[in-house]
Every structure is written in structure tokens, then in C-alpha cells.
Amino acid sequence: MKHIVKNIHFVGIGGAGMSGIAEVLLNLGYKVSGSDVGNNAATRRLASLGATVMHGHDAANVTGANAVVVSTAVSGDNPEVLAARSKRIPVVPRAVMLAELMRLKQGVAIAGTHGKTTTTSLVASVLAEGGLDPTFVIGGRLNSAGANARLGTGDFIVAEADESDASFLNLFPVIEVITNIDADHMDTYGHDFARLKQAFIEFTQRLPFYGIAVLCVDDPNVREILPFVSKPVVRYGFAEDAQIRAVDARAVDGQMHFTVQRQLNGHTEPPLEIVLNLPGLHNVQNALAAIAIATELEVPDAAIVKALREFHGVGRRFQRYGEVATPDGAGTFTLVDDYGHHPVEMAATLAAARGAFPGRRLVLAFQPHRFTRTRDCFEDFVKVLGTVDALLLSEVYAAGEAPIVAADGRALTRALRVAGKVEPVFVEQMEEMPQAILDAVRPGDVVVTMGAGSIGAVPGQLVSHQQSTQSTQGGQA
């Protein structure tokens, strides 16, 4: 195919999933171009690697392309998509291009409603430490690699499998992980949870007879589909029937310490004493998936232990920004940023924050993501948001959706006030959020910024504000 397709264009190249695929294709020797409405770290990195990145969408951008890659976030009336179709240039969904990359190697696909990015990162890190040098495509920046994708020399490619648009059914990996199954992106499945579960069953049918499905049996919905999975299964979790099982898990100084018991292929493997450089029981489960795969692939135990102990995390997944001074100069607060935007993953992250910073006041700055999700999970949002000590709530990040009555930020604010668990502060514009946080904090607080939209820029703005303040004060001194 390479002698036919040489120039590949990405519409929305700065997106997490798109930029990773673009980087791997660059490393494979393809000429890559792309467009996006904004400039971010991903577009800057791709440009530095040789990609041609254009600001804004224009029909002329696809000139010379042999294929145009699009994600589901790109509408059908995008001028570049229309131009490609008029010129008979193949328009390739992102998941189909990922599937083509997987055909070059043995695929390890990480699926599930929550935890995909962290689990994919843990798997890639453990395999790399074991000397397998995997290729990886991740939906977040792997801090140890400084990128969300890399072309390795080994036999495996590790990637996220996206159920949001059912595109994971395009993949044919040899190893699959299902972390959990929850009601999200239900528009794709006609608001029928049974259809969503059936899609995950069909996902496991993509495995070859020699493949394995690595399933978290702590999740009741994963356990429910277990009898319908016909391919070999490895069960992981805290449950007694898990083959890769964590026991004695405890939080210690922002890390998780636990013992792993392993029963695979009728053999009892030596237990592992793990120190995971991430907080939260949910991350213990994510690490168990990586341990299961590593054990199957005969990665040395010492490499597994070392990789998890030295794991540097993923961008916007409980990303610690350290201590930031309070405006009154009386002390500091701890700043953490997280991508969580579904009530289940939010609850897990907030529980991890409580465990990592016991006894401290927890301040949450949250930007809801999508009106449909806010509508569908409204009561669950009210419940989880009511567990924090102080709350700053913004308007919904639309992600291209039209507003829905009674499913916006103000509606959530009103419902939280009625519930009476916490008194929310509604922040109209995201530009006002950094100052709103500074107005709300006290010395010793833990501040978590959370959401999948533009709130991701807020932690950097807070850090920059502190640096500029210190610089000004230093100059005055």
C-alpha cells in the first residue's frame, strides 16, 4: 500500500486519538499533513517532526492527499471532507486507520467506558520495561515518553479501542482488555444498554482463536457478558475468582501498595508485591490488566514491579501540578488536574484524591462535557458533585452539541443547591475560572480541576499566574 498512498491528511489533527496515529505514520515514512481550528502541544509536536499543520479548515488543504483521515468529531459538511469526496480521495475513519496500523503488528486493544488511557499507558510502560519495545497510540500524553504515540521495533502495538462510536469493532487485535462497561455515549446504541453490552461481546469475537480477552470481573456488566465470551479469558480484579487478583491494597503517600496473586493456565505464579505510582483503587485495577498481559507475554517479574513503581503518569489523568501559593500568601494549595467527565470516573478520582490527601479540604472545579451526557447522567452528577467540600461549576462544554433545556450548568447548580450537600459557585465563562479558584481556596486545600473540555487549560494558567506574580514581586524586591 505504501507505494500508492504516500500523502495522508488528518482533519482535526490535534485531537488526542488523531495526533497519535499521525505521529506513528510519520515515523513509518509517510508524508503527513493536517488541519485544526486550534494550536496545541500535539500540533506543535507533529510540526516539529515534519508534519504540515494548517490552522483552520479549507478545501485547499486536501490538495495532493492520497487519503483523508477523520474522527467522529468532524462533521460531514466539513469543507475538507466535502473536497476529498468530490475529488474521490478516500475518507478514512480514524478507527479504520488504527486498524490498518494494527495489521502491521500484533494488536493489544484496551476497551472500556473508563480507564482506557491509563490502562493503555500502563501496558505500554510495562512491556517497554520488559524489553518488548511496543508501538503505542494513547489518548493522552505518556509523561515518560513525552508523547501520546511512538513507533517501537517490537512485535506489539498497544492502543485504545473506542466504544463511543462503536468503531472498536473495526479492530482485530490478539489481546483485548475490557476495564468496565457503563452507560455512556448511548446515542450510538439507541439508548439501549443491551446493545452496548452486545457490542462489547462482538468486540471479543474479533480475537483469533489464540487470542485472549482480559476482563475486569469486579465490574458487574463485564461479569454479565462473561458467559457469552467464547475466546480464552483472563479475569482480573479484587474479586475472589480473579486469576490476577489484588489483595491488601492500601494508599501510602499518594501511591497504592498491594499484593498480586496470579493463577494462569493452571499454574500458580509467584505473588508480586507492587508499589503503584498512582492513587486510587481504580488504578490498582488498571495496573492488574497490565500485569495480566505482561504475565501472559512472560515479561520478567522484576520488570513489571519496576515499571509500575516508576510510572510517571499520563497527561490530565490525576496530573499533579504541585503546590500553588494562595493569594493571601498565607500558604499553598495542592493542584491536580483530571480528564474525568462521567460520574463513575469522577467518583473514582475524587476517592483517590481523598485517599492521597486524607483530612484535607477538597475543592472541585468542574466543567460538564456534552449536554446529552449531562441530561442522561443528571442525578448521578448531582450525587457525585455533592461529595466535595467546595465546588466551582462552569457551563457545559458543548463538543458540537446543541443546548438541551434543563441539562446545562445552571440547572446542575440549582439541583445541587436544592440537594443541600454543597453550595456551588457557578462560573459563567471559563476565562473566569482561574480567579474563581483563587478566590475560593484556603491554605492546605486540594484543588482538582476536572473535565474533558477547555478546563484543561486552567491548571497551566494558575501556574503561570503564580510564576508571573513571583517574578513581579522579585523585581520589586
UniProtKB/Swiss-Prot annotation:
One Gene Ontology molecular-function label: UDP-N-acetylmuramate-L-alanine ligase activity
Pathway annotation: Cell wall biogenesis; peptidoglycan biosynthesis
SUPFAM superfamilies to which the protein is assigned, alphabetical: MurCD N-terminal domain (SSF51984), MurD-like peptide ligases, catalytic domain (SSF53623), MurD-like peptide ligases, peptide-binding domain (SSF53244)
Keywords annotated in UniProt: ATP-binding, Cell cycle, Cell division, Cell shape, Cell wall biogenesis/degradation, Cytoplasm, Ligase, Nucleotide-binding, Peptidoglycan synthesis
EC number annotated for this UniProt entry: 6.3.2.8
A Gene Ontology cellular-component term: cytoplasm
Protein family membership: Belongs to the MurCDEF family.
Role of this protein: Cell wall formation.
Protein name, entry field: UDP-N-acetylmuramate--L-alanine ligase
Taxon lineage: Bacteria, Pseudomonadati, Pseudomonadota, Betaproteobacteria, Burkholderiales
Gene: murC
